[in-house]
Regions:
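Short, P/G- and charge-enriched loop/turn segments at secondary-structure junctions
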Residues: 31, 64-67
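Absolute protein N-terminus
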Residues: 1-2, 130
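Vicinal oxygen chelate
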Residues: 4-12, 43-47, 66-130
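Extracytoplasmic/secreted proteins and extracellular or luminal domains
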Residues: 25, 71, 98-99
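Core segments of cupin and vicinal oxygen chelate
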Residues: 2, 10-53, 59
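A short local loop/turn or secondary-structure capping micro-motif enriched for an aromatic residue
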Residues: 61-64, 98
């Protein structure tokens, strides 16, 4: 059986990124891994269904300057399913009220999804679906 084990995201601030996914999506943070020789730190965030995100920080990576949330080649977004339209609406409003950009929605898409798209603290697009 093939399954995606985890996705990894670069961040400028491990704690800020961790708090976003813990507070709004119920992730549980694992311990921090540190490799001082490479200027590298990382941490896994696990969700209730077993899905994981690895958040990583390094001193050797130059930030790419693009408009936050702008589309680009490569990973464009990842989706988190909440199970109901009401939960999508409620979380989207909570994120908006807490100052996180809502890029789209909540809305029903042409292919039947009910979703919104928000930006995490590093400008990654997070699609919130039913």
């Amino acid at each position: 059986m093939v399954r995606i084990e985890h996705i990894a995201l670069w961040t400028n601030d491990l704690d800020r990124c961790k708090q976003f996914y813990v507070r709004y999506f119920g992730a549980v943070a694992g311990g921090e891994y540190v490799n001082p020789a490479k200027g590298f730190k990382s941490m896994f965030l696990q969700f209730t269904d077993g899905a994981r995100i690895e958040i990583m920080k390094t001193t050797t990576l130059s930030p790419v300057v693009i408009e936050p949330g702008a589309q680009r080649m490569g990973l464009t977004h990842f989706a988190v399913s909440l199970g109901s339209e009401r939960l999508v609406d409620d979380l989207t409003l909570r994120l908006k009220n807490d100052g996180y950009p809502v890029v789209d929605g909540p809305r029903r898409t042409g292919d039947g999804y009910y979703e919104s798209v928000v930006l995490d603290p590093d400008g990654n697009r997070v699609e919130i679906t039913t």
